[in-house]
């Protein structure tokens, strides 16, 4: 069982479209029951647990892959499902932080940024998604023990080729079209952002505050970039550069990429509606910390 830890603003939505097309009805965008979800609406603290996974398995016979914002390697899935194999993508912490701010803040004045960057729940997001607490050393320990593959948003195409080799899934389709792009959104908050001068994000003061808010994330990211990712590249059995170019050629000529109709229908018309009425089991909203 593969489990994708979807960390916000790391190109995870694009990767999820790849997993949907590659695994079909053996893939589930796993979600929490509505009542459980509301307890962690802001920082997504609740974890997918064994009951959530069992519920998905009952609806998805042959389930081989799950993905979601609430999939966490510290949340107990590994003890309930010893064969589960976690993977994720990380992104440069400052770039990811700014992207999340621009996507979620709602108001984009300098004062709004001051409030955002002062809110501890926004700090060290990637570290907390891995470890449940803003401690890079703990996240590194969990990665060493439980997370078997980590891609990098900054090396997305190369990471997709490496991921395909690691998954060893015959139906893997690495071609993609980027989704959930900020420039394509037209929510009221996006119109507000477009009307606001966000040049303050490029000032030395803002960069310093962002760095301070993501100090543990930076330690984690540096560890992955210098220790984990190079090992994955070294272990690749083929000519990685050539295979990346082949993926890029296929991307340019692929046209529109459609998810198979039946998995999309099942996810939207069967699985999601069922979650409105599902009762949460153990409340894991207190697992880990949100600081």
Give residue ranges: language-model regions.
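PAPS-dependent sulfotransferase catalytic domain
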Residues: 29, 36-201, 238-239, 275-276, ...
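Conserved aromatic-histidine-acidic binding/catalytic patches
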Residues: 2-7, 85, 147-155, 205-212
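Residue-level marker of structural boundaries
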Residues: 24, 105-106, 226
